[in-house]
Amino acid sequence: MWQRVKDSQKLDVNSTYCYIMLSEYFTDTCLVAEIDKEIVGFVTSLIRPSNPEVLFVWQIAVSTEYQGKGIAYSLLRDLITGASCTQVRYIETTISPNNAASNRLFRKFAVEIDAPLLESEGFSSHLFPGDIHEDERLIQIGPINHKFGGINS
């Protein structure tokens, strides 16, 4: 996962330890896509402890050579239709304006499941170290009807 993030050149690279911890302790809400035993994509997320109806998607990435093949969309769909997300009514994530791929992915997902997408202030750039980080916009999709829009859980 760490390598996929590093290769993306769009996502914030966290420590390898962080990705190991996510894989170990959030297995219900973190998925990988493998081809020939190589991780070609992943999604990390968690259900908000303060609101179990909200799934926060932290990062989603796909290897450059596999982008545009629907892997990120499939990961997101598999995640939201999984057993651990049956109570989830909203998906939230933060995206920087220059991350066109993530912006397209979440907008497409909202349309496909026929759920509203709201955009609001997320995390201001001044919260991040250095001068190179953009503001992160908060994206919220929902409410999600698991029996509507093609999602069957």
Task: Please report, for each region that a protein language model flagged, where it lies by residue.
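Conserved acetyl-CoA-binding loop-helix of GNAT-fold acetyltransferases
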Residues: 62, 68-82, 104, 108
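Conserved beta-strand in the GNAT
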Residues: 32, 38-47, 54-56, 61
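Conserved GNAT acetyl-CoA-binding A-motif
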Residues: 83-97, 105
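Conserved active-site alpha-helix within GNAT-family acetyltransferase domains
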Residues: 73, 97-121
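A short helix-loop-beta-strand connector motif used in the catalytic cores of GNAT acetyltransferases and
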Residues: 21-32, 53
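Short amphipathic alpha-helix that is part of the acyltransferase structural core
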Residues: 1-14, 34, 152
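A conserved beta-turn-beta hairpin within the catalytic core of GNAT-like acetyltransferases
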Residues: 48-57, 67, 86-87
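A short, internal acetyl-CoA/4′-phosphopantetheine-binding micro-motif in the GNAT/acyltransferase core
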Residues: 59-67, 95-96
